[in-house]
């Protein structure tokens, strides 16, 4: 089952939305992605979509 998640930047208020397969990826998701607010790559962490 694929659930919608929010990837929140650790250094600004910018976020991406995506989905993840909870059966294959247990735990919180973390990835380095481009943050257009800061114009550099930063760590994004999984957060709940409200």
UniProtKB/Swiss-Prot annotation:
The gene is rpmG. One of its GO terms (biological process) is translation. This is Large ribosomal subunit protein bL33. The keyword Ribonucleoprotein applies. HAMAP family: Ribosomal_bL33. One of its GO terms (cellular component) is cytosolic large ribosomal subunit. InterPro entries: Ribosomal_bL33, Ribosomal_bL33_CS, Ribosomal_bL33_sf, Ribosomal_zn-bd. It comes from the Bacteria. It comes from Hydrogenovibrio crunogenus (strain DSM 25203 / XCL-2). Coiled coil: none annotated. Belongs to the bacterial ribosomal protein bL33 family. GO terms for molecular function: structural constituent of ribosome. PANTHER family: 54S RIBOSOMAL PROTEIN L39, MITOCHONDRIAL, LARGE RIBOSOMAL SUBUNIT PROTEIN BL33M. Keywords: Ribonucleoprotein, Ribosomal protein.
